[in-house]
Each structure stands twice: as structure tokens, then as C-alpha cells.
UniProtKB/Swiss-Prot annotation:
Residues 74-93 are annotated as: Disordered. It comes from Vibrio vulnificus (strain YJ016). Gene3D superfamilies: YcgL domain (3.10.510.20). Residues 1-84 form the YcgL domain. This is YcgL domain-containing protein VV1058. PROSITE patterns: YCGL. Pfam families: YcgL. It comes from the Bacteria.
Amino acid sequence: MLCSIYKSSKKEGTYLYIPKKDDFSQVPDTLMQMFGKPSHVMTVNLEGRSLALVNIEKVKESLSNEGFFLQLPPPPENLLQQHKERKAQQKND
């Protein structure tokens, strides 16, 4: 299964996967407005490979059912909260 991957011009770390290069017909207009001008990153064959930040099966399922897959950036690390949790755990030990 081939798909083309585009990065967002408005949302850093956000990528849109579609089955056919430059065919955004299945992507809702509101999503395209929020996504901004898509910039083609690459076209890949999803068969027999893995992706770094997303589950390949979810990508394939979404491409088949929805006609696109939207990859959002991971949530930012809350280092302060992690530090507080470690300190609290150290007090309890």
C-alpha cells in the first residue's frame, strides 16, 4: 500500500497521510484549513515496514476507511511534573 506524506505549514510536527499524491479529496475542508498548505515529504510503501511515531496498522486502517490519516505531534514532556513525582516518591521511600 503506497501513501504520500505531507507536513503541515501551520502545525509543527503534524503530518497528513493520503493514498494518492496530491489527492486531498477525502480530507475534510476544515482539516485542510487548519493544516495549512501541505508540503510533500515523501511517498512510501507501507507494506513490510514500521513507522517511528505511529502504529502502521492504524495508518492503513484509517487510509482504507477514512481516506487519510492525521499524525499529531506527541504531547510535550512536563519535566516539572516528572520532577515533583520523583521527589514525592523519594520522600515515601
